[in-house]
């Protein structure tokens, strides 16, 4: 790896992130010059597409340190790619969703989406507390605006307020944890902290306390028990495309940076931390699935489901770095495809001016008759979330179980298997509702015509879900090529 200076090689490796910043500035200028929803939406989608194309072009220049704050390597590019592709899908769904609003201020939404994506994209490359906190706060503050961005809907403003208060508390935990570690070692570099981690005495106590506080702040961002209370309310109140962004993009970014922090800081060796994380994983799996059983609101149900899925992901986190890195990467990819598809279908069936999204289970009655393609797609997405073959979700859970058993994580693996059985029941509730006849006029229950762009996005996600579920070798080869040798 080259020295931490901004050389030509570093500039080439950092180009996708620089391009994303330039696209953000361009969209801001477009909004200032001319308010045109179509133009701003197209510019956002085109800009994100260019950033996705730039990622493989930046790969030959990696691994390289970009100042002391970032390292662009295979892992950073892989997770940034997941973030950018997911943001591209959300931008396309947002165009369809906001196009139904009619007149009104819609353009700033895309600016917030881009700044949130920029914060999320730099997190996987962060190797310093300064870049870690900068990325997570850029993401969090932008999300605050996106959550409350719903015109006259009071539920969105309420969700935004809850997120503001609790996110501020989580940021305080993060900062205090970073301060304790800096007090112990006099450095904010992940690698430097790891090099000094063998020290015993007061410094080690500060380090453990600091890591525990950082994990508490991260647990809020990942919706892990007991820091999950905000999740169902925010998921329900936010516009459906924003819910998809929170469920996927923010989770990928935060999980990637904490995985890097633990690897470089040598925290995987601490038995007390591992025991605490295992307990959080088991509680998240069981609480998320059991609470989802009680829900009649689809977005709240998927919110509790996401809590359980992040608990599953902690099995790979605990198995890292021995077996869990590849399993975590594939699981995040599978989770991104399925969650984007599920929330995307909710967005396509929703009318923003109706006061709420199509988020009640009863709203989906008769969907197989009125919207057969969307109903079949949602059925496969839900089966993937349940871990059923031949979807990506099955392969992802299989690798989690293999990684967990291979590192003797028997209790978390048992909770994973039990949670998957419970989850199958509440996913089937939605499937049964879609197959039942709707009372009254079926067509009146799903009046929104789905534009070609919406069908194309869901179709692309569906192809990935089935093809990479039946034949996961290309995805696994990409993961091993980037993360395994990054």
Curated annotation (Swiss-Prot):
Cellular component terms per the entry's GO annotation: plasma membrane
Broad class of where this protein is predominantly found: membrane
A GO BP entry: ATP synthesis coupled electron transport
Pfam families: Proton_antipo_M
Subcellular location(s) of the protein: Cell inner membrane
Topology in membrane: Multi-pass membrane protein
Reaction(s) catalysed by this chain's protein: a quinone + NADH + 5 H(+)(in) = a quinol + NAD(+) + 4 H(+)(out)
Enzyme Commission number(s) from the entry: 7.1.1.-
EC category name: translocase
GO molecular function: NADH dehydrogenase (ubiquinone) activity; NADH:ubiquinone reductase (non-electrogenic) activity; quinone binding
Domain of life assignment: Bacteria
Entry keywords, A to Z: Cell inner membrane, Cell membrane, Membrane, NAD, Quinone, Translocase, Transmembrane, Transmembrane helix, Transport, Ubiquinone
InterPro entries to which the protein is assigned, alphabetical: NADH-Q_OxRdtase_suN/2, ND/Mrp_TM
Regions that span the bilayer: 11-31, 39-59, 76-96, 108-128, 129-149, 165-185, 208-228, 239-259, 275-295, 307-327, 329-349, 375-395, 398-418, 419-439, 456-476
UniProt record similarity statement: Belongs to the complex I subunit 2 family.
The protein's role, per its UniProt record: NDH-1 shuttles electrons from NADH, via FMN and iron-sulfur (Fe-S) centers, to quinones in the respiratory chain. The immediate electron acceptor for the enzyme in this species is believed to be ubiquinone. Couples the redox reaction to proton translocation (for every two electrons transferred, four hydrogen ions are translocated across the cytoplasmic membrane), and thus conserves the redox energy in a proton gradient.
Subunit structure: NDH-1 is composed of 14 different subunits. Subunits NuoA, H, J, K, L, M, N constitute the membrane sector of the complex.
Identification of the protein by name: NADH-quinone oxidoreductase subunit N 2
The gene coding this protein: nuoN2
């Amino acid at each position: 790896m080259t020295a931490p200076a901004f050389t030509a090689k570093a500039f080439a490796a950092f180009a996708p992130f620089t391009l994303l910043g330039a696209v953000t500035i361009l969209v801001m200028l477009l909004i200032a010059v001319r308010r045109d929803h179509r133009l701003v939406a197209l510019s956002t989608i085109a800009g994100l597409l260019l950033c996705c194309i730039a990622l493989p072009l930046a790969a030959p220049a990696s691994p390289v340190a970009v100042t002391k704050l970032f390292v662009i390597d295979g892992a950073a590019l892989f997770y940034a790619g997941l973030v950018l592709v997911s943001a591209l899908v959300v931008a396309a769904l947002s165009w369809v969703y906001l196009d139904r609003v009619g007149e009104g201020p819609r353009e700033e939404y895309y600016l917030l989406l881009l700044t949130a994506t920029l914060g999320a994209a730099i997190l996987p490359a962060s190797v310093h507390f300064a870049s870690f906190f900068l990325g997570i706060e850029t993401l969090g503050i932008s999300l605050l605006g996106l959550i409350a961005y719903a015109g006259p809907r009071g539920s969105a403003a309420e969700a935004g307020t809850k997120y503001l208060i609790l996110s501020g508390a989580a940021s305080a935990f993060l900062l205090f944890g970073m301060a304790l570690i800096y007090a112990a070692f006099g450095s904010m570099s992940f690698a430097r902290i790891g090099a000094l981690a063998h020290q015993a005495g007061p410094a080690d106590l500060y380090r453990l306390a600091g890591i525990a506080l950082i994990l508490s702040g991260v647990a809020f961002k990942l919706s892990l028990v007991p820091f999950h209370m905000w999740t169902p309310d925010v998921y329900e109140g936010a516009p459906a495309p924003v819910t998809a962004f929170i469920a996927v993009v923010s989770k990928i970014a935060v999980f990637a940076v904490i995985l890097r922090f633990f690897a470089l800081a040598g925290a995987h060796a601490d038995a007390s931390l591992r025991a605490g994380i295992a307990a959080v994983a088991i509680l998240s799996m069981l609480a998320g699935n059991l609470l989802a059983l009680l829900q009649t609101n689809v977005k709240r149900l998927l919110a509790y489901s996401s809590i359980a899925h992040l608990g599953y992901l902690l099995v790979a986190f605990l198995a890292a770095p021995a077996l869990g890195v590849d399993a975590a990467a594939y699981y995040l990819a599978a989770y991104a495809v399925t969650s984007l598809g599920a929330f995307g279908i909710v967005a396509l069936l929703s009318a923003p001016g109706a006061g709420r999204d199509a988020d009640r289970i009863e709203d989906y009655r008769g969907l197989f008759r009125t919207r057969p393609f969307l109903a079949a797609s949602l059925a496969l997405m839900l089966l993937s979330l349940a871990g059923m073959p031949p979807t990506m979700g099955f392969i992802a859970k299989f690798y989690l179980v293999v990684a967990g058993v291979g590192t003797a994580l028997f209790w978390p693996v048992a909770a994973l298997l039990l949670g998957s059985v419970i989850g199958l029941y509440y996913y089937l509730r939605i499937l049964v509702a879609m197959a039942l006849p709707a009372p009254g006029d079926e067509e009146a229950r799903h009046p929104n015509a789905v534009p070609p762009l919406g069908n194309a996005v869901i179709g692309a996600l569906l192809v990935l879900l089935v093809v990479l579920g039946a034949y996961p070798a290309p995805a696994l080869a990409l993961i091993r090529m980037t993360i395994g040798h990054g």
